[in-house]
Amino acid sequence: MGLFGLTRFIHEHKLVKPSIISTPPGVLTPVAVDVWNVMYTLLERLYPVGKRENLHGPSVTIHCLGVLLRLLTQRSYYPIFVLERCTDGPLSRGAKAIMSRAMNHDERGTSDLTRVLLSSNTSCSIKYNKTSETYDSVFRNSSTSCIPSEENKSQDMFLDGCPRQTDKTICLRDQNVCSLTSTMPSRGHPNHRLYHKLCASLIRWMGYAYVEAVDIEADEACANLFHTRTVALVYTTDTDLLFMGCDILLDAIPMFAPVVRCRDLLQYLGITYPEFLVAFVRCQTDLHTSDNLKSVQQVIQDTGLKVPHQMDTSTRSPTYDSWRHGEVFKSLTVATSGKTENGVSVSKYASNRSEVTVDASWALNLLPPSSSPLDNLERAFVEHIIAVVTPLTRGRLKLMKRVNIMQNTADPYMVINTLYHNLKGEKMARQYARIFKQFIPTPLPLNTVLTKYWN
């Protein structure tokens, strides 16, 4: 997930900065929350692998969600939750979709191109069907609803395919869920996963703003919220968001939350955003296999980038065959204050008002000519990223379509009903609901928060 080795790189080079509280009292900072990324991160922290035996799955899910909402409230963050698609159909956009189409290509009578993609000596090429991607195609409104019918709401919506456990549950007290002995045999440890539909239902009925990413990946929806100036940060540990030019919030637990800004990373590397796309697309884990995947540190060494901590050791590797045309990266080693080939100053990214992705389309001019299936995949992915992060030009206007944000009116009855069907006990459900009401205030309307923050 993300760029291989980028998380280690940003920590080793101290690119993770504590967030500075700059909003006045009463003004909330809107953040996009990659729900499943954050929830599973909390699951790993609250319930280490050795302590997950005999746990009640719904209680663990409710506990993690309660901790998340409490943290966001304490840090004055206003979350817009990005929910992953609930359908079983394939994704239509993104790295996984591009890779899937290439692997299923049947141009030469075979549907398995794994051998072709992994072979470095093959001369076979894949004809990727290029599409003119715009926000109308990438972020189109979907008619698919994640809310099941009324007759299935009491069963499928809350069970999420997992067997029910015993009703001996212990309520959430002091952010702890006690262990529970299950009377059913374990089948693949179902309690080691979160109950996705339960979590999504609680988010809806508690009145939080949310986005349903139906046929796109959640990180693309988060990037759209960031580049449309809807949110100030994206709460996730997925470094793909940095690749998409976003600023990410890694953890909401510390008082001064750690933040990584894309402009700081670009300024540290001394390159522009188009050069960043071209150089580090080889590090994308969803697009490459272990045989052709490169780490961030390997790309820095092979392309000759001179970061501040390696000014006297970084040299270009003559054996790096994937970058056959070295002249493409002449601009990668220029000083931070200098100009690049396309006349864009790297130093402009130091400004808080700068938009790092404004010249993203220049990356297509920096890409070397495609001569292998892997080159075609990388070009297709870069084209897709450009379509996600850049606006659509209409004459003198530049328009960027925002994903559809929904917000239901808070319904305490439906919250209790959702808890009741998962906990099989009205008393326990009301106890959970009372704790939510006591520690987590009802969310404000989305437009009110956005107006106060951005104005």
Swiss-Prot record:
UniProt KW keywords: Decay of host mRNAs by virus, Endonuclease, Eukaryotic host gene expression shutoff by virus, Host gene expression shutoff by virus, Host mRNA suppression by virus, Host-virus interaction, Hydrolase, Nuclease, RNA-binding, Virion
One GO process term, biological-process aspect: symbiont-mediated degradation of host mRNA
Subcellular location: Virion
Cellular component terms (Gene Ontology): virion component
GO molecular function, one term: RNA binding
Keyword flag RNA-binding: yes
Domain of life: Viruses
EC number: 3.1.27.-
Main subcellular location of this protein, as a coarse class: virion
Family under the similarity heading: Belongs to the herpesviridae VHS protein family.
Role of this protein: Minor structural protein that acts as an endoribonuclease during lytic infection. Degrades host mRNAs in the cytoplasm by cutting them at preferred sites, including some in regions of translation initiation.
Name of the protein: Virion host shutoff protein
Taxonomic lineage from the root: Viruses, Duplodnaviria, Heunggongvirae, Peploviricota, Herviviricetes
